[in-house]
Amino acid sequence: MEKNIFLELEERGIIEQFIDRENLIKHLDEGNVPFYIGIDPTADSLHIGHYVGLMVASYLQKAGHSPLILIGGGTAAIGDPSGKTDLRRMMSREEMDENVEKIKKQVSRFVNFEGENAARIVNNADWLLNLNYIDFMREIGSKFSVNRMLAAECYKTRLETGLTFFEMGYMLLQSYDFLHLYNQFGCKLEIGGNDQWSNIIGGAELIRKLGHDDAFAFTFKLLTTKEGKKMGKTEKGALWLDKDKTSPYEFYQYWRNVADQDVENVLKMLTYLPLDEIKKLTSVEGQELNKAKKIAAYEITKLIHGEEEAKKAEEASEALFGNGANNANMPTIEIEAETSILDAIILAGFAQSKGQAKTLIAQGGITLNDNKVEDLQLKITSNMLSEELILKKGKKGFCKLISK
């Protein structure tokens, strides 16, 4: 008999908080439990933090449960106050609509929209933007205690700096989302990141207050290092799933260079590798862990960008470590002859300013074709660009410079 999917996710160290664990496990064993995960369209691409949730959704779907991917076109107009210290800039409807279309395409790569338990994309703008305020406050607002809401961590941290009533409405709207999906699609489970716990329990409790005892929720852990620092940040910013924002090579290199103590967690949360295989790969130390890192980098890149791009990234990475592969797949930037080394470093994304670039050179962290750069006044000449020219930052940052 296959292990219950909730227990498997627990064993992988993914689940953190939950409502009514024993009954949820029972429901998941008895048949298809439609579930939903929400994504706010506040950027035109998903990032690695979103993918943790999509992996959980993928696991649940593979176990026979139907995913509802909720695009928060309505709630994004307010903005979730969780983890925020100030009021988010409100997006225009046009911005949100553009982002929703791009995100829909990305999500479709990760969950299956065909079959008996096919995934479905819904947008809460469809039911939130035309709500009658008086009816909503009477039917939904009456079920929420302001005292209890203010005790929630997401609101408590904002009280000192100022919390608007506009933002307080976020919990009610997210809770209403669950109720709407429960009524329309039989959705019985909401999942989300552990920073969403206050908002997530609101929906399940609302449904239960209305007389239904089969509403459940659980949160998954955010992707963090052993020290508790969020993973997924690069020198250029977030680790995006859009290859135009983060190239497959840069994406691969991020996971190839993950810290030794984080490899096991990354493999558990971001791949489908069996736990016994992960244990075997990570039971070693030092240089022997490189095999696990390469497998993690390849598997995660394959899941996001496909096998062909993963192979290209792997080859480019091997080339940079002197194993004779082709450099053709390396990130490339076009520059004009006589560009200064400082500007080249900035264009490559290795520094945000000339001051930072100077510091990197002073620390011996910049090389051109493996020759350490020491001259702050160095210019990239046309002769240099006529041959292969590799700019490196330390052991982890690489790009090829070509003539514009």
State each model region's role.
Residues 207-404:
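Conserved nucleotide- and phosphate/pyrophosphate-binding catalytic cores
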